[in-house]
Amino acid sequence: MLGRPSGRPCAAGLLRRTDVLELVVAIVVVVGGVWAVAVFHLRGADLRAFDRPVGERFALGDAPGPEIGAVIASLGQTAELLRGVPMRRRNAVLRKYLDEMFDGRELGVQLVPADCGGVPGEWVLAPGADPRRRTLYIHGGAFVMGSPRSHRTLTSRFSRLTGGAVLAVDYRLMPEHPRRTGIDDCRLAYRWLLDHGPDGAAAADAVFVAGDSAGGNLTLSLLQWVRDAGLRAPDAAVALSPLTDATLSSPSLRNNLHSDPMLGPLFGPMARVPQWLLLWFGWLQTRIRPNDPLISPLRADLSRLPPLLLQASEVEMLFDDSQRYVNRAQAAGSPVRLQRWSHMVHVWQIFNPELPEARQALQQIGQFLNAAAPPKP
């Protein structure tokens, strides 16, 4: 005699389906919560209104010259350097490569180690440099590489352009140190530079600040702090291809991915990652919200800034960071300008004197700084 079929298998199947449903709901809730935090707490305001074309455009021809072709070819060595290198050693390899890139060049300047109130640095002095005419230079390198040594082709030129002393600050880098320490080091160096020159304690007659890429970000952040702290403002400042928005919202980050031969290969994989995940990664990495003006100067109060010049390439990934910053600063009433070049790589000014466009850009910088400086005594 056949008995009634047991209900246990059906109950077990129903239980399994319920468990799966609960798991799916839990995952959706967690992912939705993470997404909501990124969008409403980490991303900040939509700044697409500041995507208007702005600035002076420079070009030495309709097509790239042979010199920029040679520079781009040399950048291809980076990929070869990293081939087969474990992730944990990549920073060390890139740091060594960047520091040694321009070794052996005859710069014609004097290099003097400096202790900027506890922060190491390097004075760069062209012949006849006025020690009371001072520039604080903040190097780039994605906050993880670079040094005064790596940027001597720029700091030596700034000393000649201004006729003064350049202090290249050796701020602390990630990941060995928190992101905030680099900001603090630049602030200390600026305070110190106001009252100390290469020949000892003495007030500065003229003060400039300049930086490139990550150093441009630190430069713009420093300007906000100097204003809010009531310190003597620099007479003028320069930012070369700066990162201005740590929320990574600028359209050119994706639009110029394939036209940027320097940043594209290094950061291209990030373009495939959803922005909300990048926001979380940035927050966890720096312990600072990506939309915090401390690391996103684009999102700060941009009124009452000193005369400021930004230079950027129209084909680099960070171009819109500059364009948005200048549009927003001008709307706030600050004397901020953008100069744009076609066909150039990120921070092409460092490739001087071989690049004609680098020489042209540096000439513009010299004219800008000297026009803003107080008369020489």
Q: Where does each model-flagged region fall?
A:
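Leucine-biased recognition of intrinsically disordered, low-complexity hydrophobic segments
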Residues: 2, 14-15
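A glycine/proline-hinged amphipathic helix-loop "lid/cap" segment
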Residues: 18-126, 374-377
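Alpha/beta-hydrolase superfamily serine-hydrolase fold, recognizing
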Residues: 25, 29-45, 110-377
